[in-house]
């Protein structure tokens, strides 16, 4: 690596790395380091009147206070932080004091991983700590972490830029308290849900992510190509159609928690790669599924938070079952004053115009209704609410309503103004299903790029017979947002999709060399901030000379310095 690409701290740390090796200390040892305790457990289990407990711990050194022959550090392991008391003569009992005087005091840096063996005690200030008897270097950090300080519940020098936090999640997890807890809770959400399903006897399965037809949802897919078969394939947008095939095959209840991919926009609640759970249970309907869903979410909330109430932004959301039920057309009538019951597409278009909505000719009846609900109703449902009985045009995979053939037996659960889950009494009439697919193809021909493609193999599966079935899909990322009180999806994804990092534009070396600059000086000039020839045009030759000669000296490059006149001639040649 070019030394000019490193900061002063990075150079110092690399020099320390080399010094450790010269002393015979491997900064990245291969052997297992055996630990027997975590910081939080040590504190929780400590008793003043017991024989001091011997422990072996490992983690990052996050702070250090050196006071001559004795020092305090703060060690951070996977569960928390604990203070360690280190004295020269305890970790260096013999004549050789290098481990303390040289390694600990000078060559180790904040962020380094170390192992500590010692006993637990309480300091005079009352803090439970470890008295170190042995220190082991486990991994050297050659890039300094941001130093975030905490005192009396106040955070100082915080690492809080969202762009940096999401792009460098490893740093975010290491230095920001509370971030790791979000992902621990996410894991508990998954465990609780699986426990609920497994207790009912339903089986977890896996279905293809690469699919020949992107079916099961109305969304734009990512497309790829299989070279050996020479066919296009799609990253799945939903697992629905494959899971229903398993119900056809004889399983009574199946579920899958897996990744879906939709080639659409990114915002506070959408990521192109997201996790979804879908479950299908034979011989059930959407009424049963509503009760099943609210009990599931209540259980998850209790398991994760110990209560059914969660604060999300300014709202306190109560996940205690049962949840309110409102029909979709009833919701639209309540919030707009228009009753869409029995209206055709043109009549609904007129309603949209009266509501001053932006619509276009590609939108069919179902899309128009969906737009009305999204604009005027969805955001009003803060407490968990089932929106039921969707118009048939919006639900190509859903069974017709038993009492009204213009509607379907479908519900969506709205929480905090957003859809959380979607469920049906599944359409199992193969003739009706094929007709619905054909209607979707007509929408596609009109320009609706989210219309579903006909999956003939799925229709064939239905022709063999699928029992009455109810299915439900839930966005695991949004569920985690709610259970952890987060307002953006990026906060609950370890590595959310990010736009490419901005790269500072730089001219090639040849452009600088056209001015008479030797190639070896180009990196120095760019290190000084003159990344393009044009950046030098208005600069004072004296200042420019000081800048580049200063870098030559600071980094000990031992280049022959140009004169001020040489620099002035370079600048004069810039057109």
From Swiss-Prot:
The reaction(s) this protein catalyses: tRNA(Lys) + L-lysine + ATP = L-lysyl-tRNA(Lys) + AMP + diphosphate
InterPro entries in the cross-refs: Aa-tRNA-synt_II (IPR004364), aa-tRNA-synth_II (IPR006195), aa-tRNA-synth_II/BPL/LPL (IPR045864), DUF4332 (IPR025567), Lys-tRNA-ligase_II (IPR002313), Lys-tRNA-ligase_II_N (IPR044136), Lys-tRNA-synth_II_C (IPR018149), NA-bd_OB-fold (IPR012340)
Domain of life of the organism encoding this protein: Bacteria
Subcellular locations according to the entry: Cytoplasm
Protein name stated in the entry: Lysine--tRNA ligase
E.C. number(s) listed in UniProt: 6.1.1.6
GO biological process: lysyl-tRNA aminoacylation
Organism: Bacteroides fragilis (strain YCH46)
């Amino acid at each position: 690596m070019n030394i000019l690409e490193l900061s002063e701290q990075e150079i110092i740390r690399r020099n320390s790395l080399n010094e450790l090796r010269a002393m015979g200390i491997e900064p990245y040892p291969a052997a297992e380091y055996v630990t027997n305790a975590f910081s939080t457990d040590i504190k929780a289990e400590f008793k003043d009147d017991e024989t001091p407990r011997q422990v072996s711990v490992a983690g990052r050194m996050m702070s250090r206070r050196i006071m001559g022959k004795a020092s305090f550090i703060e060690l951070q392991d996977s569960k928390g932080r604990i203070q360690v008391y280190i004295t020269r003569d305890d970790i260096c009992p013999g004549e050789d004091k290098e481990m303390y005087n040289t390694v600990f005091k000078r060559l180790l840096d904040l962020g380094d991983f170390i192992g500590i063996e010692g006993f637990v005690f309480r300091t005079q200030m009352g803090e439970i700590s470890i008295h170190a008897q042995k220190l082991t270097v486990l991994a050297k950090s050659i890039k300094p972490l941001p130093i975030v300080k905490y005192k009396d519940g106040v955070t100082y020098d915080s690492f809080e830029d969202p762009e940096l936090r999401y792009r460098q999640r490893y740093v975010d997890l290491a230095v920001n308290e509370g971030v790791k807890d979000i992902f621990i809770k996410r894991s508990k959400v998954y465990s609780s849900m699986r426990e609920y399903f497994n207790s009912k006897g339903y089986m977890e399965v896996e279905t293809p992510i690469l699919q020949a037809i992107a079916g099961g949802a109305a969304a734009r897919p990512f497309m790829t190509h299989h070279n050996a078969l020479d066919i296009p394939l799609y990253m799945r947008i939903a697992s629905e159609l494959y899971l229903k095939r398993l119900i056809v095959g004889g399983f009574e209840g199946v579920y899958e928690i897996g990744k879906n991919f939709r080639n659409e926009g990114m915002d506070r609640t959408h990521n192109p790669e997201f996790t979804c759970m879908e479950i299908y249970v034979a011989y059930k309907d959407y009424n049963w599924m509503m009760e099943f869903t609210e009990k599931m979410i209540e259980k998850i909330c209790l398991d994760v938070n110990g209560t059914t109430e969660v604060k999300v932004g300014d709202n306190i959301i109560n996940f205690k079952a049962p949840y309110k039920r409102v029909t979709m057309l009833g919701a639209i009538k309540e919030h707009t004053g228009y009753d869409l019951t029995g209206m055709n597409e043109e009549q609904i278009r007129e309603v949209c115009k009266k509501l001053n909505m932006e619509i276009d000719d590609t939108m069919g009846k179902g899309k128009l209704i969906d737009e009305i609900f999204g604009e005027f109703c969805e955001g009003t449902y803060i407490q968990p609410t089932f929106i039921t009985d969707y118009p048939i045009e919006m639900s190509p995979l859903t069974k017709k309503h038993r009492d009204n053939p213009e509607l379907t037996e479908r519900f969506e659960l709205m929480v905090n103004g957003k859809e959380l889950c979607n469920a049906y009494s599944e359409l199992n009439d193969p003739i009706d299903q094929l007709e619905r697919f054909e209607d979707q193809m007509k929408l596609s021909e009109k320009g609706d790029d989210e219309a579903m493609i006909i999956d003939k193999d799925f229709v064939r599966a239905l022709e063999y017979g699928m029992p009455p079935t109810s299915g439900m899909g839930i966005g695991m990322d949004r569920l985690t947002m709610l259970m952890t009180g987060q307002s953006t999806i990026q906060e609950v994804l370890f590595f959310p999709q990010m736009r490419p990092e901005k790269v500072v534009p730089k001219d090639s070396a040849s452009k600088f060399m056209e001015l008479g600059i030797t190639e070896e000086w180009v990196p120095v000039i760019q290190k000084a901030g003159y990344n393009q020839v044009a950046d030098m045009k208005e600069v004072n030759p004296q200042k420019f000379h000081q800048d580049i000669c200063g870098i030559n000296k600071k980094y000990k490059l031992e280049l022959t310095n140009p004169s001020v006149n040489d620099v002035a001639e370079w600048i004069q040649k810039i057109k």
